[in-house]
Amino acid sequence: MTSSNLFITGCDKTTEWMLPWFIHNFKKHNTTPLKIFDFGMTNDMKTQIRSLPKSSHSDRRMIISMKDVQSKGWYKKPEAMFRASGMAEKVCWIDTDCHVLDNIDDIFDYTEPQKLGMVEDKPWTMRTGGKFHNSGVVVFEGTPPILDQWRKKVAEKN
C-alpha cells in the first residue's frame, strides 16, 4: 500500500474536457492523493495534466493507463477501483463531473471493511421499480467481494 487514503477518477476522450476543472477544484480543497485512470484520454490531455503545477500531494504517477482493459468508458470504472484497492487502505472513486466545493476527506470515516459505500439512485429506482445505486461517488476499504463480482460481470458483458 502506498497511502492510507486515495481519491481516484477516470475518463476517456469524450469526458476528459471536465478533468482540468475537476482537478483544480479538488486540489483547491484537498491534500489527499488523487490518481486518474486513463480510459482512453488524448495525448494532449495527458500532457496538459502532467504539466499542472505539482503540489505536496502530487505523485509522479498520477495518470494510470487502462489500455489493457477491453471494456469502454464507464465500464472500466470497476476495474480501476479494483486496481486502486491495492494502492491504499481506503479508496474513493469520484466522477469528474462532481463539483468539489470543500475538503471531502471525511468521506473515509464512513467506510466499512470489505463493503462499497454508495447511495441509492432514487430517480432510477422510482423509474424501474428495482433498487439502483449511484456510482458517481463510491468509497470502500480493502477489496470488497462485491467489487470483484462487479468488475468480472462487466468484463463478461463488454
Predicted regions and their residues:
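Glycosyltransferase catalytic domains, chiefly GT-A lineage
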Residues: 1-158
